[in-house]
Swiss-Prot record:
The chain crosses the membrane at residues 153-173, 235-255. This is Putative transmembrane protein ORF289. The lineage of its organism: Viruses, Adnaviria, Zilligvirae, Taleaviricota, Tokiviricetes. It is a multi-pass membrane protein. Residues 174-234 are cytoplasmic. It comes from Acidianus filamentous virus 2 (isolate Italy/Pozzuoli).
């Protein structure tokens, strides 16, 4: 059961670059990729045999004692169509009201399932997303520059994954004020979000040179490259988004040496054979040790 590369590329591109604005001399439009609904597509030998809408989406959001935040999203749906078919693969897609957007997951069945016109096919799929302690914003960052702080620990980067997995994510947060993620509602506006635009080494602001999103055989990554000279030692390197209340920190890592010119921070997550998107990793390079 594989999390799709297309989904991760969609999320990380949005985190890095924000919404896509399309303008001409006569029109202006904003491309919105957040789903209106979730669709399950049944296939057999790579040919679509049926599809159904996911009718139930449940979400939980908790932070454990190790300062890791975990989102659990469970999709449930039923194909009650009056069709007879065999399926060996089920794909989970984000969709508008009329068109597919991006594939979320691909479920290869160990044994093909056969459905008659009198049968119901029940579908359940769970995604668990964990962000480690390098993603939960702490008040200690405020000693370096003005950053957004929260009443409880939260990993802002998870907001964006849920945005592309849960229809009407903003509404879900309003209905669940005890979720740690609900604290982000005042700081992120999905329709106007412009991507990562802040990078610091301790109290030194970094000039962002490039933001790259790419993939390998098993991973998708954001790489933010910057230019700065810093003599601070053991200072955090962090990236985020500027808000009227300070920087909303999305990821950070500590670097033990000084930095003479260039710095880079990488956020990586894995696609492949698991229903769990692996804990994020940060890698920091640049400067001298």
């Amino acid at each position: 059961m594989a999390i799709a590369k297309e989904f991760l590329l969609t999320v990380l591109n949005y985190i890095a670059n924000g919404v896509v604005n399309v303008q001409s001399s006569t029109t202006q439009a904003v491309t919105t990729l957040a789903p209106y609904q979730i669709i399950a597509i049944m296939k057999n030998n790579n040919v679509t045999v049926s599809r159904t809408t996911i009718t139930s989406i449940s979400v939980s959001d908790v932070v454990n004692a190790s300062q890791e935040e975990t989102l659990t999203i469970r999709y449930s749906g039923t194909d009650a169509s009056p069709f007879t078919y065999t399926t060996d693969e089920i794909e989970i897609w984000a969709s508008t009201q009329s068109a597919l957007l991006y594939k979320i997951a691909d479920i290869q069945l160990q044994t093909p399932l056969s459905k008659t016109e009198h049968d119901y096919l029940n579908i359940e799929y769970e995604i668990i997303i964990t962000a480690g302690a390098s993603y939960t914003t702490t008040s200690s960052m405020s000693q370096y520059t003005s950053v957004v702080t929260f009443r409880t620990l939260v990993a802002p980067i998870l907001y964006f994954f849920a945005l592309f997995l849960v229809p009407a994510w903003s509404t879900v947060l309003k209905q669940n004020p005890t979720f740690p993620q609900s604290q982000l509602s005042n700081y992120i506006s999905p329709s106007s979000y412009q991507g990562i635009n802040a990078m610091y080494v301790g109290s030194n602001q970094v000039t962002i040179v490039s933001k790259l999103v790419g993939f390998g055989t098993t991973t998708v990554s954001i790489v933010v490259n910057g230019e700065v000279t810093s003599t601070q030692v053991n200072a955090p390197i962090f990236i985020g988004v500027t808000t009227p209340s300070g920087v909303l920190v999305l990821a950070y890592n500590y670097y033990s040496g000084t930095i003479s010119k260039y710095v880079s921070l990488t956020v990586t997550t894995t696609y492949g054979s698991a229903t769990v998107i692996n804990q994020f990793e940060t890698k920091t390079t640049g400067g001298t040790t």
